[in-house]
Amino acid sequence: MKWLLLLGLVALSECIIYKVPLVRKKSLRRNLSEHGLLKDFLKKHNLNPASKYFPQAEAPTLIDEQPLENYLDVEYFGTIGIGTPAQDFTVIFDTGSSNLWVPSVYCSSLACTNHNLFNPQDSSTYQSTSGTLSITYGTGSMTGILGYDTVQVGGISDTNQIFGLSETEPGSFLYYAPFDGILGLAYPSISSSGATPVFDNIWDQGLVSQDLFSVYLSADDQSGSVVIFGGIDSSYYTGSLNWVPVSVEGYWQISVDSITMNGEAIACAEGCQAIVDTGTSLLTGPTSPIANIQSDIGASENSDGEMVVSCSAISSLPDIVFTINGIQYPVPPSAYILQSQGSCTSGFQGMDVPTESGELWILGDVFIRQYFTVFDRANNQVGLAPVA
């Protein structure tokens, strides 16, 4: 059987690729809403997506300013194993951050009681360190320690991987989070405490034959989505991949030519920057143009603070077109209007960027569901093609 599998892999390609299935679940927002907690949560937390990318305050070297509320709408999750024998965790594969962290048995917070906890004493390969980790959000921080262990990711045994073990997770809202931790896939330059990101460690050990990974997010309610390490599977897209240079090697940041609706520029008229982020669900941009888009599509705020649209209007709404490196990438209303349990909400979100970097957009899952995306570290570029 093993020989048959090996022959099949060789016949398929000279490159062996590893696929991590992603499962689509209810987002933290939906869980809070169903428990009657969303309105109170939104009232207490002034959500600003920009804080994930541009912390407002400088922090010590060991502090990772990564607000956890930014994962409020994420719906795609995968399973990894840490330790020997492996202890399983549900994580967000996040191209908008670079650290790996999971809850640990040292955590006494309410949020940890509803999640899988890593126990170093149950792993024969765990190595402790004196390093610490603190991820800030809202009114508190997730604090923890750093350690090394073997991480199992889609059939890859990533040995000697540094990761964070949470000790406190303030904020009872995390109790309802459908994920245990975060696996960051951005560049090492934004990694907290100089920790080597998972994909960098995998590549450095020669565990994949190509220095890239790719993502397919299915619109299906549950299955089909995947992260592919070390290769590209053309069955997930149509046509050819179009390549876009990374403009800043930190996040997966690219240049956008324009953003139009009905042939008219609605934002980014003179070009702008965008971050391709699997850890953000929505299409996020500056407050002013987003407010105009919300008005144009007839979105209004409901009692929970969500921007809702009449479901019957979807068929009459226009595409939003992102022109990137000379190629047009339309996002249809069926993609940017999110339908759930008979209600329709806008897939756009405003943010205030406290930097001098100009107009910045976040191309989250609303965009990635439309376009198979390759994150090419070898050539510092992003590949995009319409999903099959």
Swiss-Prot record:
<dbReference type="InterPro" id="IPR001461">
    <property type="entry name" value="Aspartic_peptidase_A1"/>
</dbReference>
<keyword id="KW-0064">Aspartyl protease</keyword>
<keyword id="KW-0222">Digestion</keyword>
<keyword id="KW-0865">Zymogen</keyword>
<keyword id="KW-1015">Disulfide bond</keyword>
<feature type="propeptide" description="Activation peptide">
    <location>
        <begin position="41"/>
        <end position="62"/>
    </location>
</feature>
<dbReference type="Pfam" id="PF07966">
    <property type="entry name" value="A1_Propeptide"/>
</dbReference>
<feature type="disulfide bond">
    <location>
        <begin position="107"/>
        <end position="112"/>
    </location>
</feature>
<dbReference type="GO" id="GO:0070062">
    <property type="term" value="C:extracellular exosome"/>
</dbReference>
<feature type="modified residue" description="Phosphoserine">
    <location>
        <position position="130"/>
    </location>
</feature>
<feature type="disulfide bond">
    <location>
        <begin position="311"/>
        <end position="344"/>
    </location>
</feature>
<keyword id="KW-0597">Phosphoprotein</keyword>
<dbReference type="InterPro" id="IPR034162">
    <property type="entry name" value="Pepsin_A"/>
</dbReference>
<protein>
    <recommendedName>
        <fullName>Pepsin A-1</fullName>
        <ecNumber>3.4.23.1</ecNumber>
    </recommendedName>
</protein>
<dbReference type="InterPro" id="IPR001969">
    <property type="entry name" value="Aspartic_peptidase_AS"/>
</dbReference>
<keyword id="KW-0732">Signal</keyword>
<feature type="signal peptide">
    <location>
        <begin position="1"/>
        <end position="15"/>
    </location>
</feature>
<dbReference type="InterPro" id="IPR021109">
    <property type="entry name" value="Peptidase_aspartic_dom_sf"/>
</dbReference>
<dbReference type="Pfam" id="PF00026">
    <property type="entry name" value="Asp"/>
</dbReference>
<feature type="active site">
    <location>
        <position position="94"/>
    </location>
</feature>
<comment type="similarity">
    <text>Belongs to the peptidase A1 family.</text>
</comment>
<dbReference type="GO" id="GO:0004190">
    <property type="term" value="F:aspartic-type endopeptidase activity"/>
</dbReference>
<feature type="domain" description="Peptidase A1">
    <location>
        <begin position="76"/>
        <end position="385"/>
    </location>
</feature>
<dbReference type="GO" id="GO:0007586">
    <property type="term" value="P:digestion"/>
</dbReference>
<keyword id="KW-0964">Secreted</keyword>
<dbReference type="InterPro" id="IPR033121">
    <property type="entry name" value="PEPTIDASE_A1"/>
</dbReference>
<dbReference type="GO" id="GO:0006508">
    <property type="term" value="P:proteolysis"/>
</dbReference>
<feature type="active site">
    <location>
        <position position="277"/>
    </location>
</feature>
<comment type="function">
    <text>Shows particularly broad specificity; although bonds involving phenylalanine and leucine are preferred, many others are also cleaved to some extent.</text>
</comment>
<keyword id="KW-0378">Hydrolase</keyword>
<feature type="disulfide bond">
    <location>
        <begin position="268"/>
        <end position="272"/>
    </location>
</feature>
<dbReference type="InterPro" id="IPR012848">
    <property type="entry name" value="Aspartic_peptidase_N"/>
</dbReference>
<feature type="propeptide" description="Activation peptide">
    <location>
        <begin position="16"/>
        <end position="40"/>
    </location>
</feature>
<keyword id="KW-0645">Protease</keyword>
